[in-house]
Amino acid sequence: MEGGGVADVAVPGTRKRDRPYKGIRMRKWGKWVAEIREPNKRSRLWLGSYSTPEAAARAYDTAVFYLRGPTARLNFPELLPGEKFSDEDMSAATIRKKATEVGAQVDALGTAVQNNRHRVFGQNRDSDVDNKNFHRNYQNGEREEEEEDEDDKRLRSGGRLLDRVDLNKLPDPESSDEEWESKH
């Protein structure tokens, strides 16, 4: 052993760290994109641009599953059990459509969860216990309606949630500046 018996060790800053999942890459401006090479061809299937690496990886997984079958190496093998694989060849356009649908759903879900976390965690810091319970409920895939209703009532009634405006957060597209000015 010429190398002194040292196994291959991942060095920080290597490509593995830049690409957390197979089949995706990050653009300079922070978006994650997914693409896959068609079998026996030089062409690539463009699977879309996403805001999270998980969404891009799920789009890639869907495409590789339909292109290469159930034996394909997936990023999230546990998340594709409901899919039925058929031996019939699917067109590239059909595979792209299925993959982009999955990626868009994951991206939208991630964005919705992120927005709710910003709304609750960024503005309501009065109760750490409530925040921990809210986070735990999100991890379990559920959110109690009474918490949501209570937050909405406080927002509408001019409660403490609006007293602490986070200037680093983008405004909700549903509310306008005119609504804010008319209330104050």
From Swiss-Prot:
Residues 20-77 bind DNA. Residues 161-172 have a biased composition (Basic and acidic residues). Gene3D superfamilies: AP2/ERF domain. The keyword Nuclease does not apply. It is found in: Nucleus. Its main location: nucleus. Residues 123-184 are annotated as: Disordered. Keywords: Activator, DNA-binding, Ethylene signaling pathway, Nucleus, Transcription, Transcription regulation. Residues 174-184 have a biased composition (Acidic residues). One of its GO terms (biological process) is ethylene-activated signaling pathway. GO terms for molecular function: DNA-binding transcription factor activity; transcription cis-regulatory region binding. GO terms for cellular component: nucleus. SMART domains: AP2 (SM00380). Signal peptide: none annotated. Belongs to the AP2/ERF transcription factor family. ERF subfamily. Probably acts as a transcriptional activator. Binds to the GCC-box pathogenesis-related promoter element. May be involved in the regulation of gene expression by stress factors and by components of stress signal transduction pathways. This is Ethylene-responsive transcription factor ERF010. It comes from Arabidopsis thaliana (Mouse-ear cress). The lineage of its organism: Eukaryota, Viridiplantae, Streptophyta, Embryophyta, Tracheophyta. The gene is ERF010.
